[in-house]
Amino acid sequence: MVRPRRAPHRSGAGGPLGGRGRPPRPLVVRAVRSRSWPGGPRGPQPPRIRARSAPPMEGARVFGALGPIGPSSPGLTLGGLAVNEHRLSNKLLAWSGVLEWQEKRRPFSDSTAKLKRTLPCQAYVNQGENLETDQWPQKLIMQLIPQQLLTTLGPLFRNSQLAQFHFTNRDCDSLKGLCRIMGNGFAGCMLFPHISPCEVRVLMLLYSSKKKIFMGLIPYDQSGFVNAIRQVITTRKQAVGPGGVHSGPVQIVNNKFLAWSGVMEWQEPRPEPNSRSKRWLPSHVYVNQGEILRTDQWPRRLFMQLIPQQLLTTLVPLFRNSRLVQFHFTKDMETLKSLCRIMDNGFAGCVHFSYKASCEVRVLMLLYSSEKKIFIGLIPHDQSNFVNGIRRVIANQQQVLQRSLEQEQQQRGMGG
């Protein structure tokens, strides 16, 4: 059974990664040898990936498949996650194959080009343990990800089986290049192809430059980890411009994590009767660190309709059962000021997702707090009922506007 060791609680303000103004505190992980995967209500149980081992030696501490370690063994860090490791010894070969990845070329070459690398690779486990790899593919494709993007996945990393990876030194340049990259703050993510019949879908590879070893983590909660790592990769792509050029650091605002970037478009009323002007702003959606918002299927452009808040009172029960995200707009300050003024005067934004979009979100609401100067997005959990409710609201609004227009025309006719 994996037993995370909790760091002592310290009072003070701040999020889950530590107090305000302080760097994230390492999450120290310890585990004991287990005869089987965690059972019962403690988490998902992959039925085939099993770790079995003999009882631990007296006085020894064991972390997953990496064997006994001393109390002062150096740690392998993954962002704020500190993991202990052990040299390759008394291990059993569990898998042999090829690892493939792409790395950027040297700065003096074409910066947009990537160099494909491959290395013969073996995975080892402790004697007495069993890692079922008979369905693993013979070639694993690895994507390199900055470790700083993985700090939110600490709870999923803790609940993992470990295996030690070893590379045959046939290609010293490739191995040195991989050690250099991973020693400078990168981790490897191996996504197993869906056509593969094995139950492992993702595996993470870490490197200790001090111990000169590679360690693989196989999360027990494969489904949860796949969703989380997809979110990380999506965020990574959004933070990197065309050709792999960074458009800036990964944005974290008030301990919130960037989940989506695109454009918000809407029409706002003009002073002239029945006249509207089209507006748009670059837009970003943030979630709390550790939360996952599936935005990989969101369109790059969202269309918003402004609705008087007084028409939304009947939807309050559906608003209560919603997920909250934070919106941030950039660049055109005049357009942003205009949007703030309109929404501060009693309007809310209804963002309809195109039916062509394959994401599960069909509608979200945008509200503005003039006191805190922030935009809050509400994503109702009951999308179907909310869509029906908002349609009725919009239909009623159109009827009210139509009656108002007819009355205005009648008054003009009587005055003439």
UniProtKB/Swiss-Prot annotation:
Localisation per UniProt entry: Cytoplasm; Nucleus; Cell membrane; Cytoplasm, Perinuclear region
Primary residence: cytoplasm
Modification after translation (UniProt): Ubiquitinated by the CRL2(KLHDC2) complex, which recognizes the diglycine (Gly-Gly) at the C-terminus, leading to its degradation. Ubiquitinated by the CRL2(APPBP2) complex, which recognizes the Arg-Xaa-Xaa-Gly sequence at the C-terminus, leading to its degradation.
Compositional bias segments (type: Low complexity): 27-39
Alphabetized Gene3D superfamilies for the sequence: Mediator complex subunit 25, ACID domain
Keywords assigned: Activator, Cell membrane, Cytoplasm, Membrane, Nucleus, Phosphoprotein, Transcription, Transcription regulation, Ubl conjugation
GO CC field: nucleoplasm; perinuclear region of cytoplasm; plasma membrane
Sites of Phosphoserine modification: 53
Residue span of region Disordered: 1-54
Biased composition (Gly residues): 12-21
Keyword Transcription: yes
Record's keyword annotation contains Phosphoprotein: yes
Pfam families reported in the protein's UniProt record: Med25
InterPro entries referenced in this protein's UniProt entry, alphabetically: Med25_PTOV, Med25_PTOV_sf
Region of interest (Interaction with FLOT1), residue spans: 184-416
Function description: May activate transcription. Required for nuclear translocation of FLOT1. Promotes cell proliferation.
UniProt record similarity statement: Belongs to the Mediator complex subunit 25 family. PTOV1 subfamily.
Quaternary structure, from the entry: May interact with CREBBP. Interacts with FLOT1.
Protein name: Prostate tumor-overexpressed gene 1 protein homolog
UniProt organism field: Mus musculus (Mouse)
